[in-house]
């Protein structure tokens, strides 16, 4: 008899263009599926025989959607012939180990020559300068179908493994944290239709998953914040970050029939309102165009229905030829920063990245550099 060690897990992503990606994950991954039940109870007064029936019965109504979550590091790299990759992909083009996950989150359903696409329209494009990930194809009612996540957990002796397949997987959310003491980490979560036992697939794309030179150091992160020229809050603000978070969410809903007499199973999903939001923390600083000035500007503009800032977060800094990640949000709406009175007073500013027009898809663009 062998036991299984969670630290030996491998994650594979398949179901797109006949490719299989291996994605290294961090401790804390999870996946589960529960049953939705109905309880029928009896509650009556005492009868002539002195009996009061108090029984109950349970019914399985349906299977809830599979819920999964895991974390990866943000790991950009330049392609090389030394690793397995898609046909047509070019050496020295910039990619990311977790690139496929961004594509699936933002509507991609094909992989062609190193780029993620929705049909023939690009979701990600890569060249020798950067990897660009856009939201332009994310206005879709459903995400890619047929996606399978396979978690393979070897046993202690190495003589076998358990493989769990999450079928019909759809990515709901990606949340990137940049605590300055750590490495840039992305937390992924989503849902699927069923969990089944399977087998480990054969990897076709595993570029740079064993590299140790493509991690992003959060301490090097910088922030540029500029008010729109149409705003009464004019100028640029220089905030030195102590931490932060950016979250992209599809607000998915899974659909499950409600027929009686059978255990219903989820049949698929629909997307909800797409949202990009986040928070930025920094020390309270009275330097010119610092956090104190931003707080004052926002409190003095409370009469404005909306505000608009051009927000650029450079996770890992701006130095060329180093691993880094940039979020560009050109129409960000900021809330009044909140103070935290610890030993050193700090402020937290929350924001929502919005499209220029309500039906647009330009609320954010993501770029990797290596």
Task: Give the label of every model feature segment.
Residues 1-370:
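Signature of extracytoplasmic/envelope-associated structural regions
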